[in-house]
């Protein structure tokens, strides 16, 4: 399957058997497949405690509505890291080779996450771009550099128009391409507009997000009709 679409979920796990990367046993001719776990996780407002005047993050500050102290922040990091470390470990013995994330405030929280006790030995690398989302949440990807060779990454902005003609800035789509072991795979990380305000009112935003996703996929398939594409995310 070249294109895997994941519908609305908070945590998605895919154990990928790479058929082109099998190992031949010296004692018999059985194929032994390399297994990679690929996951997506909506970490639900992973914010640091620092107030960013450019975004609406006031609730996630020590004096904000959520009383977002460093103790609470560190606890959230620890809990998320434990979940990630356990994903697919029964098959691979380690954390996922690739994990897409959404509701990330900035690159600093990603650095804090990969340096937790549960993940610091996994040697994760970060792919992140600041998006124009008004709440300040972004999508991102973590990958193990010993399993994934990055070739390119790019963001695609999604602009929604309000009734008064102004622009509603939301999350970008993130495209990451590279070799997972020896297979070239393209990953699209999504976080589509929510149903805030009701499904009917918010549906046009998700339709535009779907069209943008298809545009990205079509551009890849135009270059290689047999390209391996995984589109992951919270599709709301």
Where are these regions (language model features)?
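Active-site-proximal beta-strand elements of phosphoester/diester hydrolases
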Residues: 37-45, 152, 184-194
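Catalytic metal-binding/acid-base residues of hydrolase active sites
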Residues: 44, 105, 193, 235-236
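Bacterial Sec-dependent N-terminal signal peptides
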Residues: 1-31
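Structured beta-strand-rich core segments of catalytic domains in phosphoester-bond hydrolases
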Residues: 104-184, 192
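Active-site His/acidic residue clusters
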Residues: 54-57, 183, 187-202
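Flexible, glycine-rich surface segments
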Residues: 195-236
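N-terminal, active-site-proximal structural segment of metallo-dependent hydrolase catalytic domains
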Residues: 23-117, 127-139
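Loop/turn elements at helix/coil->beta-strand transitions in domains of secreted/extracellular proteins
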Residues: 34-37, 94-98, 121-124, 181-185, ...
């Amino acid at each position: 399957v070249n294109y895997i679409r994941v519908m609305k979920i908070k945590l998605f796990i895919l154990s990928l058997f790479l058929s082109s990367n099998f190992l031949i046993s010296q004692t018999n001719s059985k194929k032994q497949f390399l297994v990679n776990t690929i996951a997506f996780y909506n970490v639900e407002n992973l914010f640091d405690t620092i107030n960013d005047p450019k975004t609406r993050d006031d609730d996630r500050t020590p004096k904000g509505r959520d009383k977002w102290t460093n103790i609470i922040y560190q606890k959230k990091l620890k809990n998320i890291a434990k979940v990630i470390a356990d994903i697919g470990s029964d098959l691979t013995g380690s954390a996922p080779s690739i994990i897409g994330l959404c509701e990330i405030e900035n690159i600093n929280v990603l650095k804090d996450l990969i340096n937790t006790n549960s993940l610091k030995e996994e040697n994760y690398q970060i792919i992140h771009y600041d998006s124009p989302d008004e709440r300040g949440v972004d999508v991102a990807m973590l990958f193990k550099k010993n399993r994934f060779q990055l070739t390119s990454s790019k963001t695609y902005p999604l602009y929604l128009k309000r009734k008064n003609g102004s622009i509603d800035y939301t999350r970008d789509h993130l495209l990451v391409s590279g070799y997972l072991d020896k297979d070239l795979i393209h990953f699209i990380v999504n976080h589509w507009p929510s149903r805030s305000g009701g499904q009917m009112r918010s549906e046009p935003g998700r339709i535009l997000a779907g069209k943008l996703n298809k545009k990205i996929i079509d551009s890849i398939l135009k270059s290689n009709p047999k390209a391996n594409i995984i589109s992951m995310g919270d599709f709301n």
